[in-house]
Structure formats: C-alpha cells, structure tokens
UniProtKB/Swiss-Prot annotation:
Designated name of the protein: Uncharacterized protein RP104
UniProt record similarity statement: Belongs to the TrbL/VirB6 family.
TM spans (from-to): 332-352, 359-379, 393-413, 495-515, 522-542, 555-575, 700-720
Keywords attached to this entry: Cell membrane, Membrane, Signal, Transmembrane, Transmembrane helix
Disulfide feature: none
Species this protein is from: Rickettsia prowazekii (strain Madrid E)
Localization of this protein: Cell membrane
Entry annotated with the keyword Nucleotide-binding: no
Primary location: membrane
Gene Ontology biological process: protein secretion by the type IV secretion system
A Gene Ontology cellular-component term: plasma membrane
A Pfam family assignment: TrbL
Length: 1124
C-alpha cells in the first residue's frame, strides 16, 4: 500500500509527458490550447475550469453571469464550487445513449426540454477515482503502442492518439432525478458531494446545500405548457396553436393566455397600437402605470384587472402587496368582527326589548361589507386555502375607481362644441377603452402646437373627399400664433417670440399637470386601497367611524380631481377655438396610416388614425344650421390662415358669380348695385381724403378682435391655472396635489425664463457688436490724438505709497488739452465715491482737505502717447475693477473701528453651484436683497445713525427716522443681524476724547477723520496697476501684470463661476500688493541698512506665492526707476 501513491504519481507524470507530446503534435498551432488541454486532463476540477474558459457552460443549460458564481460561492462555500466543476448537463459527448440519456443534438436544445408530465432531469458527475483509472489505462495502451513501434519500426502516434482519446463516459457517473430526489456522490479529494433535484418555476435544477438552503447549480427548462410559466408574460395571445396543440390532451395554463407582454408587445406597444391619434404621447405612459398597478395589487403574472379570475386559488397571488397585507391583518380583522358581534349581543341582552328587523339586517350587512372589502370572503367553506377568496377591493373597488378616473374625465373631454378631437364614437377594445381620453388630449396638444400639420397636409388631404373646385387642397392646421414667429425671427424681437409661444407653452403646462395629477391620483388610490384592511374595519364602531369616512372621502376626491382639471382644459380649449375659429365645425375620417407601414419596411400595420379637419361643406345643415355660423367660420382668423387659397377663391367666386348671373333691367339700380359686394365695400369714410375699401377694414377688425380675445383668454387662463390644484381639491374636499405633482405653470415659467435669458443674451451680443464698431472707429484717429496729447502736455497727480501704511493724498489736475483724461478720471472718482460710506460733514472741512493736497508737476516728455481707443479700454477696465471692489460690509467693518459704528452680518447665503432655474433665481433674489441692505445701511449711516452710542442732544430728522424704520424692518425679518461689539483699542479712545471736547471741536475731529478715511479708501480702490505706474516714477517700485482674464460673455454656470473666482483673485492680488508696498517692500533697488520687519516678511511671502502660482508677473525693467 505504501507504493500506491508513488505509482499514481509516476502514472500522472508519464501521462503528462505523453499527453504533452501528443497534444503538442496535434495542436501545435495553438500552444495555449495545448496547455489548457493538458491541465484539464489531470483532475475533474481542472477539467471543469477548462470547460468554463474555453467552451459554453457544460454544467447548465441556462447561462448565468460570472458574478452569480461569486455570490453562490459565498452562500455555499466549497460545496458549490466542487459540485459546479464536476456537474455535466450540457455535454453532447455524454448524453447520447441509454445509460446517460439519448438527446439528439444535445440536452439543452428546445426540442429536448423536460416534459412537464415526467419532470425528470438527467445529469452526470465527474469522478476522480475513475479518471485515474482511465488515465492509467491510457498510459498502458501508450506503452504498448511504443513497444510495438520499436519492434515493428512503425509510427506509434496513431495508436497513442487513440489511447489518449477523451473517453468521458469512463470517468463520469450518470444520475437521474425528479423534484425532491437527492443523494450523495463519493470521490477522491473532497469525499462527499450532496445533490438534490429541485423545481424553480419552469426550471428543474441540480442543487447543493448552502447557508440559505438549497442552492441551484445547473438547471434545465421545461416544455410549455405548465403552471407558473415565466414565458406567460410574452406569449402571443393570438397564437393559440403555439399554446395548445389540438392533438395534445395536456391542459393549457390559464396564465399563458394573459394579454401581458414583456418582450414582443409591451405596455408601450400595446397602447401605441390601440391609439387612434396621429401623434401618440400620453397613452403609453398611462397603460404602463395601469399594468404596474395590476401587478402590484393582483399578481405579477397579470397586467389587467380583467384577469383577476385567472389567479383565484393560485399561489401566484403571494406576490401581491395587497394580499400580503391582508394575510397580516387577518387576525386583527377577525378580532374586530368578534368584538362587534359581542357588543351587538350585549346590546340585545341589555336592551330589554327586541330590536327592529332593520337593525339585524344592518348588523349582517356590516359584517359582510367589512369581510368582503378587508380580507375577502372564502368561496369554498370546505377549502381552507387563503388564495381562494372573493376580494372586494380587487374585484370591484379598484376597477371602479381607476376606470372611473378616465371615464368621468372622458365624458368632459368629448363635450367640445366644435367636434374637434372627439374619440368617444370610435371602437376600442374593452381593455383599452380608456385610451379615448388620452387620445383626445394628445390630439388637442398636437393640434395647438402644430404637430399635426404634416399629417393633415399629406394624409388628410389624400383621404377625405375634397371639393377641389373650392381649391382646398392646400389646407393645413397651423396654429395662428405660429405666424407671429415669422416677423419675430426677422426682427429679432423676443417679445413677439414670447407672445407666439405663450399659449402653446401654457397648453403643455396644463396637459403635463393633468397627466401628472392623474398618475398621482392613481397611485394615491392604490396606497389607500392597500390600507383597506386597516380602515374598513373602523366602519363597525361609531368611535372609529370618522377614520373610515376620511378614507372614503380621500378615495372619492382622487377619483374626481382629474375630472375638474379636464373641465378647466376643455373650457380653455373651447374659448381658444371660438376666438380663432369662430363657429367652425370639424369632421373626422378614420384612415389607415400608410406612412407607418413604409417606415416599418412595408409590413402591414394594425394601427388606424382618426384625422380631424374643418368641414367646408357650407350646405351641411347638421353642423351649420344658419348663415351666421357659416360667415363666422369663413371670417375667422384660423380658417383664413389655414385655408388661404380657399379663402381667396371663395371671395372671387362670390363676386364674379354676382356679376355674371345678374342681368340689368330686371331690378332697380340700387338693388342691382347692392349685389356687388366689392362696390359696396368701397366707401368714403368720414375724415378721409381717399376712397377706402370697407371690406378690408372689416377683415382687419376681425383679426384684431380675434387676437385681443386670444390674449385676454390667455391672461385669464394663466392666472386661474396657478390655483388649479387648490381649486380641484376644494371642489372635491380632498388634498391638493400641487406639492406632489408638477405645478400647472411650471413648464410655462421655465420656458419664459429661458426666452428671457435668450433675449438678454441677444441684446448683449448686439450691444457688444455696436461697442466694438465704435471702438474701431475711434481707433482710426490714433495718430491725431497721440500727437495732440503729446504736444499739449498735462499735469498728473500721483498717489505715493509710503512704508508702514502711511499715504500722502494728492489732487489730480489737468489742463484743457487733456480733457478726455480728466473726464475719465472724474467718472472713476464718482463711481468710487458712490460706494464709500461716510457721515455728513460741514463744508468747512474742505479747507482742511485742500491744505493737505498738492499738485506735482510732471514734464511733458514723461507722458506716453495715448490713443482714444486705449483710453476707452482703460476706462472699461477701471469700471470693471471698481465693480469688483469689496462689499460695503467689509468697508463698514474697517470704518467702525474709528467711528464707533455698529457692525452687521448678512444672513442670506447664495448657492455655490446653482443647479436649475430655481436656484439661479434664488441667487439673483439674494443679490438683490444684499444691494437693498447696503443701500439701507448707507442711508442709515449718512443720516447720523448706526453708532454704538448715540451723541447727546442730537436732533432726529425725518430722514433719520425713515432710515431707522427701513433698517429695523430688515433686522426684524432676519436678513441681517446687528453686531454691537466695540473696538476697545481705538473706539474707546475716540469716545473718551470726544467726551472731553466740546461739540464744535468734536465735529471737526470727525470731519478730519472722515476725510482721511475717504482719501484712504479712494487710494485703495484704484487699480493696483495704476498706483504702481504713478508711484514707481517716484519711489522705484517694481511693476506687475495680472495674468488672469475673465470671459467677455460668460455662458453657463461654469464660466460665471470662473469669472467670480478671477475677480476674487484680483482683489487678493490688490490686497497683497498694497500690503507689500505699505510694509516697505516691492522696490527695484533696496535701500541700505533698512531692517526687514515681520510685517514685510509676511507680505513678501504672500506676494512670492502669487508670483510662483502664475497669477501675476513682475516687471523689474521699469525706466522710471531712475527717478527713485
């Protein structure tokens, strides 16, 4: 026995060497296949891995993803993998005889599926012990072949190839089993393998044990028909021969006849084929929602409430959410009924007299009602199955409520006086009869949006019987407001575009609200219906009766709300029709849609389309009972625009017929002339010099009246639609849907906002183009302006920045020749002054201000020639920089330390990355509120208020009172919060000094301090580039350039955010440069013996970081440094 493992090892090595030589010779072209073949021949496990990598799955007939294998290994570690690698089901080399099973073409073909009468599965398991014996036999045969070749000098490879043929039946053990059969397989390595045959719906599987029970490893499908088929959701209902063979006595599955379809004809295709309108939009959505509700409430095997009887007494109801809740509430409902019977019995015993018969009847009816609508009534008392029950919610309540939503709304939708989009007389199948409502809605929306223009022009004109003598072959249903787009596009006026699109956008908004409201009502009815076992038993007792009443009231409210919305839509459509089309009546014709046949490759389509067109048969008294109705239609704006050739032909025909048919002499002259309409239409109006055609003015008047009526209707409907959800809820005493459904004006407002944005962008582009042209014109005079400026000279004042933060203010003066520069300087100064917050001061302060101001003359040769184009460009950059200065909040913080002003914080915060129109609008509102706060604060401080401690004996003016009132409103509303913390280092000293001085001296100190502050703010608000250019001529400062550039016309949130970041970066550069210069740094040549303070070191560190990051670039080759 000790030599037995060694013999096995030697046999395996010889097998490996011989197999390598043989396989390499046979499969020399593919080395990878050779290696895999050798490895797959060693053990059953390696052979299973090789089959998994190179061929289709041999362990199963149903393909599964590799992720499934990983999950199953976690559920059943070791057992699943060992069974998985040894199991064989899909192997044509094995299953071709009586021992393993004879399956021509393979066990997994459609013809060889399992018979439901005899659900037996054939499979095999690989055995390592038999594999070793088979390999040893191959080694022995190979040795004999080699010996024979040595003795006979023949080629041994044919014999060796025959010896090493893969004889799978030698090392596989066949098994057969029906659902429930199990057993064990014993082998070398992992000694025991447990297997069990199970049935999973239409599959028979070989399983093994796992943590969750039986884990299927390999499966095979069963033939049709059989109960609980997974194919029943996509079997064609009309293909009865496929479902049931007349020669086969096997009963067909009732669920296989269900008209559901998840593959061939889904909910979308079913609704699309049943629809009769040209443009299908909403009916597929409603059909899919109805199928989802049926699957949720009844069973996942059905998709319509018409198929309820097919799942009675079947376990497929277990998948129903309502059924599961009913089973859970069974004992609770039984307890309620028991208490009700007990209380009724106590009432009989304690009453002392026999109650009337009506009370007995009421008692019995209540028990039946509660049982029927909560948990269902058992059909067969002898059968205790929980599936065999009559359920009132499934069989009566839900069909009534869900179909009632569409039925009531359909009655109103088809009540249009003009006959447009009436689908109630068209035949629909019983299961899809509700589509008539949504076809009417789609037809209306398509008609008012002009989506059916091509269908009317190409299809309708071909099929309906035209009177071509009236030249009506060029008729199309283009909405009248579409014609406003023509002048709007030509002129670029966005106001006309908004007017032209306002009504169709409102139609889309209200239609979207109707669809959304109907879906939300259906879902709400489903939710309330599932809770029926909880609320229906409350009907038994007076104490809980209110809960049941509220439940029923909500159900009825959700039933009626869509009808209210449809009534509003029909009113809006009717007023629109009358305003544009007068009393025109529509006719319809059901045609076959040959266009779809051509699109589908010539296949015959079952879909027919109902086309509506204006009835131009003026002799049809059923629709035009009097002459006024005919004239109203002919003179309407819509008819004239939709039938231009017909209108011109009718006008010419009427006039020519009167001329031709009339004979002079038969009537008086006045009667004869009255027949000529074109002559009676030419009259001399009062106040007119020329003869005016009266008929033309009549047409224009009718057109204007139609437009005014349409605009007035649009205004009324727009304002009423904002309260449509609340109105529908109040009418039905229910819950408003405006919080859970899209609002009726949502799409309208979003589209109008988009049009407004587009109009603003268009206007901005036009202004930019006009500005660019002006700049180019000014640039043409560059030589003249440069010479003029150079010859005239100017005196320029510089702002000199001194170390330690001190600055000497200067006043800029210019000569007459530099008037352009002077005007620009004044403009910038005025813009800066408007942002600075300072209290009022007496006029005497100007003498002190002038005393510290001085002019610095500058030689003419130091001024560079400047063109008007450069001046305009610099002016724009200056204004842009001024707009990017810090907010008033920051300026007041710096000023409050010196003036004792209270501080405040702005509490509203903008969205960092606004998404959608709503957040962008909120950001705009917050920015407007910030501007309002700044204005209120400036007015408060300018009026003498806003200090931590008020001055004594100071009169309160009306301006101050109003400013305080406005500021108090902002504080009370929570927009701002006052901060009255004081700066003890400066403010207390200032207050102490102010208390010691008299009133006149105190006012002068305040004025001097405010002037100093004005000069400081004025210096800090100028561009850093300008300050450097002015001061480097005096102090030898280095120059720099700001490298970031904003988008000229930012498009989208991303570019707007980038511009904001660049502006923030520019402010950071300004602060860093000012701090560097004020600390004594930033010079081209350092002064000897100057000590570098900590402030300067920090400033230089910040500035170096900005230079290294590429935000700014230093320029140290400035020629003006010679003057330092």
């Amino acid at each position: 026995m000790a030599l037995f493992p060694r013999s096995i090892l030697i046999a395996l090595v010889l097998s490996f060497v011989l197999n390598l030589g043989l396989v390499t010779k046979i499969h020399a072209k593919d080395t990878l296949d050779s290696i895999i073949d050798i490895l797959s021949g060693l053990t059953c496990e390696t052979q299973g891995v090789g089959d998994l990598m190179r061929t289709e799955f041999s362990h199963t007939c149903i393909v599964a993803p590799f992720f499934t294998f990983a999950v199953m290994n976690l559920v059943s570690p070791v057992l699943y993998m060992n069974t998985f690698l040894k199991l064989k089901i899909n192997d044509s080399d094995l299953f071709n005889d009586s021992d393993f099973g004879n399956f021509p073409g393979g066990q997994c073909t459609r013809a060889n599926r399992i018979d439901p009468k005899n659900p037996e599965l054939r499979f095999a398991l690989c055995n390592n012990a038999k594999l070793i014996v088979s390999r040893a036999k191959s080694v022995a045969e190979s040795a004999l072949a080699i010996a024979k070749a040595v003795l006979t000098w023949s080629d041994p490879w044919d014999d060796i190839k025959q010896a090493w043929e893969n004889k799978k039946k030698e090392y596989h053990i066949p098994y057969r089993g029906k659902p429930g059969d199990d057993g064990f397989a014993f082998d070398v390595g992992f000694p025991v393998i447990y297997w069990k045959v199970i049935q999973d719906r239409d599959r028979i599987c070989v399983s093994t044990k796992g943590f969750t029970g039986d884990v299927p490893v390999g499966c095979k499908y069963m033939k049709e028909p059989f109960p609980k088929s997974i194919y029943n959701s996509f079997i064609d209902v009309e293909d009865k021969n496929f479902i049931k063979d007349p020669t086969n006595d096997t009963p067909s599955d009732p669920l296989a006849l269900v008209s559901c379809s998840a593959a061939g004809e889904g909910c979308y295709q079913k609704a699309y084929n049943a629809s009769k309108t040209a443009v299908v939009m909403t009916s597929p959505l409603i059909e899919c929602i109805k199928q989802m509700i049926a699957r949720l409430l009844i069973s996942k095997d059905v998709c319509s409430f018409d198929n309820v009887d097919q799942v009675v007494n079947l376990s497929s109801r277990q998948d129903s959410a309502l059924f599961q809740f009913q089973v859970g509430m069974y004992k609770i409902v039984t307890a309620f009924l028991t208490l009700y019977v007990m209380f009724f019995g106590f009432k009989l015993l304690l009453a002392g007299k026999v109650p009337p018969k009506s009370e007995y009847i009421n008692f019995i009816l209540k028990i039946i009602f509660v049982t029927y609508f909560s948990i269902g009534i058992n059909i067969n008392p002898a059968n205790g199955s929980q599936y065999d029950r009559l359920d009132g919610m499934i069989q009566w309540a839900f069909p009534f409520l869900l179909n009632g939503i569409n039925g009531l709304a359909s009655w109103v939708m088809n009540a249009a006086p003009s006959g447009l989009c009436k689908f109630n007389n068209i035949h629909y199948d019983g299961s899809v009869s509700y589509i008539a409502l949504w076809d009417a809605l789609d037809c209306r929306v398509a008609h008012y949006l002009g989506l059916d223009i091509l269908s009317t022009l190409l299809v309708e004109n071909t099929y309906r019987s035209h009177d071509f003598l009236n030249f009506d072959f060029f008729s199309f249903s283009a909405p009248p407001y579409i014609y406003l787009l023509i002048p709007a596009i030509i002129s670029g006026n966005m106001m006309l575009v908004s007017l032209a699109l306002s009504y169709p956008l409102l139609v889309i908004s209200v239609a979207a609200f109707m669809v959304n409201a109907t879906i939300m009502c259906m879902i709400s009815i489903v939710i309330l219906g599932i809770l029926a076992p909880l609320f229906v038993p409350m009907f038994l007792f007076a104490y809980t009766r209110n809960y049941f009443d509220s439940w029923v009231k909500l159900m009825i409210s959700f039933l009626l709300q869509p009808m209210v919305v449809v009534t509003f839509m029909i009113t809006m459509f009717a007023v629109y029709d009358y305003g544009f089309y007068g009393k025109c009546q529509y006719k319809s014709k059901l045609i076959h849609n040959s266009i779809e046949d051509k699109i589908q490759g010539g296949l015959k389509s079952k879909r027919d389309v109902l086309i509506f067109y204006i009835n131009n048969d003026w002799d049809d008294t059923s629709q035009y009972p009097d002459k006024d109705s005919v004239e109203s239609c002919k003179n309407s704006l819509g008819y004239m625009l939709n039938n231009p050739i017909n209108m011109a032909f009718n006008f010419a025909k009427d006039n020519i017929s009167e001329i031709v048919n009339s004979k002079p002499g038969e009537t008086t002259t006045d009667e004869f002339l009255s027949k000529f309409q074109f002559l009676s239409g030419v009259v001399l109006g009062p106040g007119m010099f020329f003869m005016s055609p009266k008929v033309l003015f009549e047409k224009i008047k009718n057109i204007l009246l139609a437009l005014v009526t349409a605009c007035f209707t649009l205004y009324l409907m727009y304002n009423f639609s904002s309260q449509l959800a609340e109105f529908a809820a109040d009418m039905t005493e229910g819950v408003a849907l405006n919080n859970v459904a899209i609002k009726p004006q949502a799409i309208f407002k979003a589209a109008m906002a988009a049009l407004s944005t587009a109009g603003t962008a268009t206007k901005g582009i036009d202004q930019m183009a006009s500005r660019g042209g002006g700049a180019r014109d000014l640039g043409g005079a560059k030589g003249f302006v440069s010479d003029n400026t150079a010859s005239s000279g100017s005196a320029v004042g510089d702002n000199i920045a001194v170390s330690r933060g001190a600055s000497t203010p200067t006043v800029t003066t210019t000569t007459d020749s530099s008037s352009i520069t002077n005007s620009i300087t004044k403009t910038v100064s005025s813009d800066v002054r408007s942002d600075i917050v300072t209290p009022h001061s007496p006029t005497t302060a100007f003498s002190q201000h002038s005393s510290i101001s001085s002019t610095i003359p500058t030689s003419v040769h130091n001024i560079k020639p400047t063109s008007i184009k450069e001046i305009v460009s610099n002016n724009r950059e200056s204004k842009k920089e001024i707009n990017n200065t810090m907010r008033s909040q920051e300026k007041i913080k710096s000023a409050s330390k010196a003036l004792g002003l209270i501080d405040y914080s702005f509490n509203l915060k903008e969205h960092d990355n606004p998404i959608g129109v709503k957040q962008i609008r909120e950001n705009a509102e917050i920015r407007d509120k910030r501007v309002e706060v700044e204005k209120a604060w400036n007015e408060l401080v300018a009026s003498g208020r806003g200090r931590i401690r008020d001055q004594q004996s100071e009169a309160t003016s009306e301006r101050r009172t109003n400013a305080e009132k406005k500021w108090k409103e902002l504080v009370d509303s929570g927009v701002v919060t006052e901060i009255r913390e004081r700066d003890n280092s400066v403010t207390n000293q200032f207050d102490k000094l102010a208390d010691e001085l008299d009133k006149s001296k105190k006012s002068k100190v305040e004025e001097n301090k405010n002037i100093t502050k004005d000069i400081k703010v004025d210096n800090t608000n100028t561009l850093p580039q300008e300050k450097v250019d002015n001061t480097n001529r005096r102090s030898g400062l280095i120059d720099y350039s700001f490298n970031l550039k904003e988008h000229d016309n930012p498009i989208g949130v991303k570019q707007i955010r980038e511009n904001a970041e660049i502006r923030d970066k520019r402010v950071k550069v300004e602060k860093a440069w000012n701090e560097l210069v004020a600390s004594g740094g930033g010079r081209v040549q350092e002064q000897a013996g100057v000590k570098i303070t900590e402030r300067r070191a920090n400033a230089e560190k910040v500035w170096d970081e900005l230079v290294k990051s590429g935000v700014v670039t230093e320029k140290r080759d400035n020629s003006s440094n010679e003057n330092s």
